[in-house]
Amino acid sequence: HKNFKDAILSWRPVFNECPASSKNLYLFGIDMYKNFLETASDVAIKNAYCDTIMMLHDRRIKYFGEEGKVLGYKGIDLLRYRRSDGVEFIKQGYEILKKSMEIENVKSQPAVVVLYITASISLFMDKQIQNEQVINDYIMASEILDEQLKKSPSSKIQQAKESINKNISDSKALTCEA
């Protein structure tokens, strides 16, 4: 088990003084702050750790690129840790994942695609977006996964496809009355 409490003492100065030194600085930093967040009991502290994780994703993009891919990780993390804190976090996660998918297109990770549809449906259920938007989101997601299945079929992609199909079917967003 990693000793993050000790590790942060040497990590922080490197992060502050040499932010472009290594992508691993960000990978390790995110792991470390996720551990802190998941073991914290105070809500304000958990939220501060989540904010730090978001900042680390942004800095990783700034120094090492891979914007679409890293935005996918950022959107997943935001929704994992803040989804239950209010619809504004779902909206923010949805927008981050949408941008990730627009950049990555057929290289989008299946988890990003599935979570994007889940967020879209959540926003529809909360009357934040119309069913037409959910349908457009589903079409985009479905096309990405179909293209991935054509290029290199895998059970992971097939499960993602089945998951978005089930979620969209269960959501009632496809009704003619909506």
Regions found by a protein language model. Name each.
Residues 1-178:
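Preference for long, solvent-exposed alpha-helical segments and helix-linker "stalks"
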